[in-house]
Amino acid sequence: MKLKGEVALVTGGGAGLGRAIVDRYVAEGARVAVLDKSAAGLEEIRKRHGDAVVGIEGDVRSLDSHREAVARCVETFGKLDCLIGNAGVWDYQTQLADIPDNGISEAFDEMFAIIVKGYILAAKAALPALYKSKGSAIFTVSNAGFYPGGGGVLYTAGKHAVIGLVKQLAHEWGPRIRVNGIAPGGILGSDIRGLKTLGLQDQTIATMPLADMLGPVLPTGRVATAEEYAGAYVFFATRADTVPLTGSVLNIDGGMGVRGLFEASLGAQLDKHFA
């Protein structure tokens, strides 16, 4: 068990990638507090993991919600070793030209309030407890933090901002607290919702044929599931193996940045030599 005795707080842990992180952390011996807006999602986690988890229903746009989550975490488990800022929303690749003039300010505010301010508020609330435990913070970025097309103009700008947040907090908090990011690519079965201000709140990535869209253009040849991404969050939360690791963002997106000009990858050519 790689996280035995550790305590984590996961925002947006009620479903999707966040839920997979919670499940994996518990399997690795950690106890986990989960901040999520879905009471039903939190109840499912409680039934699955029992006393190893504590759920806090709240809004990641509220500092009070984050403070309550940290307080409940420390009250229940005695400490906080690792903050995972993960709650998110997507713009379904909405381009700037398609955002109406009378909705752009509201859409910007909604996006950045969740994926940027929400992380900053989580960090602010968790700082005293993380300082005490000499722990770490991990923020979910995205391949959109590195490349265009992983979202629209709002999501891509927001995820680039998260990379800046990771680097700045690593500078401000080192050497007392480590801060890193993890940038997944497409997630098979993800249920991340769209911006309400753009009328996308009922859409989920789960309805998109991601395997067909992305699999052929990735060097890995397939789209990973949330469970397959969760292992990276375990590694970043370990203490003994990550002593020099801070201010880093792990780009874990199936090799999107090393695609060839004409083919995604050339590994199939090895078959004629070794198959």
Curated annotation (Swiss-Prot):
Pathway: Aromatic compound metabolism
InterPro entries given in the database record: BphB-like_SDR, BphB_TodD, NAD(P)-bd_dom_sf, Sc_DH/Rdtase_CS, SDR_fam
Matching SUPFAM superfamilies: NAD(P)-binding Rossmann-fold domains
Enzyme Commission numbers on file: 1.3.1.119
GO MF: oxidoreductase activity, acting on the CH-CH group of donors, NAD or NADP as acceptor; oxidoreductase activity, acting on the CH-OH group of donors, NAD or NADP as acceptor
Record keywords: Aromatic hydrocarbons catabolism, NAD, Oxidoreductase
Gene Ontology biological-process annotations: catabolic process
Pfam families noted in UniProt: adh_short
Top-level lineage group: Bacteria
Active site: Y155
Catalytic reactions of this protein: (1R,2R)-3-chlorocyclohexa-3,5-diene-1,2-diol + NAD(+) = 3-chlorocatechol + NADH + H(+)
Family recorded in the similarity comment: Belongs to the short-chain dehydrogenases/reductases (SDR) family.
Function: Can transform various dihydrodiols of chlorobenzenes and chlorotoluenes into the respective catechols.
Name of the featured protein: Chlorobenzene dihydrodiol dehydrogenase
